[in-house]
């Protein structure tokens, strides 16, 4: 299973990629008002070298209670990718290290007992049309 997870606290952002059971992560401190450069984060975990976004099975982000803006930015970025690729996106409520986040995302997704319950974990929806 291939999982991509992102967390941000506003002044520290991390990205983690799980390919089967191997985890590759990158974390960086930045000014609170700076928007993360997502291309740079993806490049640092091997995007277009060891994986492509279309190969990801599950996207996850941390719902960080310390920075609602950081959570909205992260969720919006991953939601756009997940919708475009028709892949699941889940939110993790715990305050975890980035490596732990990707592990918990996998466990949460796989622990769903049936397809209906898995669908309830997916936090993406199609945009409404007028």
Tell me what each language-model feature is:
Residues 28, 46, 64:
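Short, flexible active-site loop motifs that bind/organize anionic cofactors or intermediates
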Residues 58-63, 68-89:
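DPxDG-like acidic metal-binding loop motif
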């Amino acid at each position: 299973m291939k999982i991509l997870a992102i967390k941000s606290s506003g002044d520290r952002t991390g990205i983690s990629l799980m390919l089967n059971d191997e985890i590759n992560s990158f974390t960086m401190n930045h000014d609170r008002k700076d928007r993360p450069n997502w291309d740079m984060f993806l490049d640092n975990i091997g995007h277009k070298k060891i994986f492509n976004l279309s190969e990801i099975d599950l996207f996850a982000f941390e719902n960080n209670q310390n920075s609602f803006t950081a959570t909205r930015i992260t969720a919006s970025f991953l939601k756009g990718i997940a919708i475009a690729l028709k892949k699941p996106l889940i939110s993790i409520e715990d305050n975890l290290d980035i490596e732990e986040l990707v592990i918990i995302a996998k466990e949460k997704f796989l622990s769903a007992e049936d397809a209906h319950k898995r669908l309830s974990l997916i936090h993406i929806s199609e945009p409404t049309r007028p």
